[in-house]
Design a protein with these regions (language model features):
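Preference for bulky hydrophobic residues occupying beta-strand positions
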Residues: 35, 80-82, 112, 127, ...
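Short coil/loop residues immediately preceding or within conserved phosphate-binding loops
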Residues: 19, 79, 109, 212, ...
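Structured N-terminal alpha/beta-domain signature
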Residues: 167-168, 173-175, 189, 193, ...
Length: 283
């Protein structure tokens, strides 16, 4: 018996990722995407687009290519990474081009390149996918890589707020459980996990933005909330994301790197892991 794949929230609701305005269309073997940047997409305290949003757009382009290749099976993300040449722009339009690098019997890999309005490079990313292990999970209606978005911004609140992601304490961010956190395989959306990991890392680096973010998806988050804990030293961070509603199981391990700021000069390690391991009596 087939299980219907449904990535949307309840009737009358709009999925948070649709609010990002990322429109896609096919061009030969490539998949193109674009969206205008609005202030609500900025990293708090900066005028730069969130790197996690670029990760989400990379995941979208690569994921749609995977859907097109393995449909009616539902793809799940194995790895996702994004790397920027310089801090991302804070206005204008971002353009992305996705291409399949390898399509094997079990794993599909796609790459994505991002540019600005003038064609200048912003950064690049890659993602790998496999078919969901549950063979009953299939798309039961036609799928399309062409996704039009109504003109104008749909994001009316800061992205983390709209997604239900909050910084709980230094080094810790929580993605609240909601219908919108789940994807077509009925697991926590990989792009929203990227946002949660970014928030955990940036909570230890106020005013900074991420130069890179890499995520390895170890097992699906099935219940939520998702809790990310980060440790950062000299701008390099490692992050673990756990499913708090499923016995705190480790779902994702991630690494991050911030662009240098004028306040970063051999900063000591910070984060909940470091504090827990610090010997008593040391300052």
């Amino acid at each position: 018996m087939a299980t219907t794949a449904n990535a949307g929230p309840g009737p009358g609701e709009r999925h948070v990722l649709r609010d990002l305005g990322w429109a896609t269309s096919r061009s030969g073997d490539e998949l193109h995407g674009s969206a205008p940047i609005v202030d609500e997409m900025h990293v708090p305290g900066t005028e730069h687009l969130r790197t996690s949003i670029l990760a989400i757009w990379a995941d979208t382009l690569a994921g749609l290519l995977a859907v097109d290749a393995i449909s009616p099976r539902v793809p799940v993300t194995l790895e996702l990474d994004i790397h920027l040449f310089r801090p991302s722009p804070g206005s204008g339009v971002v353009h992305g081009v996705g291409r399949i690098v390898k399509s094997g019997r079990t794993v599909l890999v796609a790459k994505v390149d991002f540019t600005d309005d003038d064609g200048g490079p912003i950064g690049f990313g890659a993602a790998s996918f496999m078919a969901a292990p549950d063979q009953r999970l299939v798309f039961t209606s036609p799928t399309s890589v062409d996704q039009a978005i109504p003109e104008g911004s749909l994001l009316e609140a800061p992205f983390a707020e709209r997604a239900g992601c909050e910084r709980q304490s230094p080094g810790v961010a929580v993605l609240a459980r909601s219908d919108q956190m789940f994807n077509a395989s009925h697991t926590v959306n990989g792009g929203l996990i990227a946002l949660t990991a970014e928030e955990a890392a940036l909570s230890l680096s106020p005013g900074a933005t991420l130069a890179s973010l890499g995520l390895r998806y170890l097992q699906p988050g099935r219940i939520g909330p998702a809790i990310a804990e980060a440790e950062v030293r000299d701008g390099l961070g490692r992050i673990e994301v756990r499913d708090a509603g499923n016995d705190g199981r480790l779902c994702v391990v991630a690494t991050s790197r911030t662009f240098p700021t004028q306040h970063e000069a051999r900063a000591p390690a910070a984060g909940p892991w470091h504090d827990a391991k610090r010997p008593k009596g040391n300052s």
